[in-house]
Amino acid sequence: MSRPALNTFISSITLGALALAVPPAQAAEPSAKDIMEKVTVTRKLDGSEAVVKMTVTDDKKQSRERDITMATKLYDGGKTEKRIYRFLSPADVQGTSVLVFDYETKSDDVWIYLPALRKTRRIVSSQKSQSFMGSEFSYGDLNIPAIDDFDYAMSKQEPFGGETCYVIDVTPKSKDVAESEGYSKKTYWVSKDKFTVMRGLFYDKDGKLLKELVTGNIKLLDAKNKRYRPMHMEMINKQNGRRSVFDSSKVTFAPSTKDEYFTTAYLERS
């Protein structure tokens, strides 16, 4: 081998060794807002149907159970999720139904049908902080919040529920959003692997801890698009001692869910 060729060969080996010696740059962590945007995407399914048992426990540890059927479907290229909840039992709530149009960039539309009155009532934005059918969940808690209505900050990473989680503080950008939600701040523990909320803390308008959300039994329902849903959600009111649990069963990924389910006409069917 000639000297120039030998020098080139040695230089190539040296550069290769240096490249191996330098550790690869670690991928930058996503921003807090990016994480919450991913959470929003991850919970959306093209369509789904489920049976839900809602258990409401008061401060004296007395519980009431309600059986619900639920269906969801995406519209407008995924920018709108429509949901319907229909109460099957007990008798005092049988036939009550709730229809939600959950929009990505504007205030949601919510209607509730009360069979005793044979009347459908629209729930306005200022009522979103009200209790969902006597539970510790509000109507707003069950909806997907508009991402641009909030500021986001990641405080740390820590384990929760068997998952390594990002811990993210979420604060409303305006008084109107805060009043509509009923919270001055929320803190979420978000799984780094599944991008689902594992835990949430909700603070009232005075900054005092109001409620804690804990989720579990996370299921992969759409493997192709990596869409997850918690089968268990528990909301604990830290100020009055009440708690409510949603346990989902018979959950199916169903893109062909009927469009007629998501109409006020269907809402009023017995």
What name fits each language-model region?
Residues P30-A116, A153:
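N-terminal mature ectodomain segment of secretory-pathway/periplasmic proteins
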Residues V22-A28:
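Sec/Tat signal peptide C-region and signal peptidase I cleavage site
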Residues L74-E81, K156-T164, A223-N225:
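Short, ordered beta-strand-loop transition motifs
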Residues S11-A21:
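Bacterial N-terminal signal peptides
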Residues M1-I13:
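Bacterial N-terminal signal peptides that target proteins for export
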Residues L99-F101, D109-Y113, K119-I123, K128-P145, ...:
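Gly/Pro-enriched, hydrophobic low-complexity segments
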Residues A146-D151:
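Surface-exposed beta-loop interaction hotspot
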Residues R269-S270:
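Short, solvent-exposed mixed-charge patches
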